[in-house]
Amino acid sequence: MSKYSDFWFDNRRTSLVDDLLSDDKPVKKGKDHIALAGHKRAIGNFVRIVSGQNIPVKFPSRGDSFTDGKSVTIGATINERNFDYVVGLALHEGSHIAYSDFNAFGDARNLSKIREFELTHYKMEFFRGMINYIEDRRVDNIVFRGSPGYKGYYHSLYNKYFNGK
């Protein structure tokens, strides 16, 4: 169970149909598509809140999580156990939309060409990775300080990706 979001999960019922039916049969374990749709909707809401824009959120079955500045892609399995860190991912990617300059890397790359710094593909990827790391910490810090209610989601994200928990 998610530590920071379990207070608003409804683990007893997942649909209006459940509310209308009064049978005593236990619900079979399995993928709850209604709950999954609710989780995706909630994650999309987090992106829209932190970015301040109506940003579409995509949920491929696998892959990386990222933003191109116009949409957010969350490439993680979503369930109640990992929901907190997935919300952390969504907040992180949404914060890039709100606070990142998506032209900055290209501008920095062009400046390095002016200085006659020979950029091989390897150096360019290293350079891009370093800029991304710094930018990630910067935008996370902005949201972390400005919205203390999201701290738990960020802690879950960092524990998953950086602290080995």
Language-model regions, residue ranges each:
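Basic/hydrophobic alpha-helical interface regions
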Residues: M1-K165
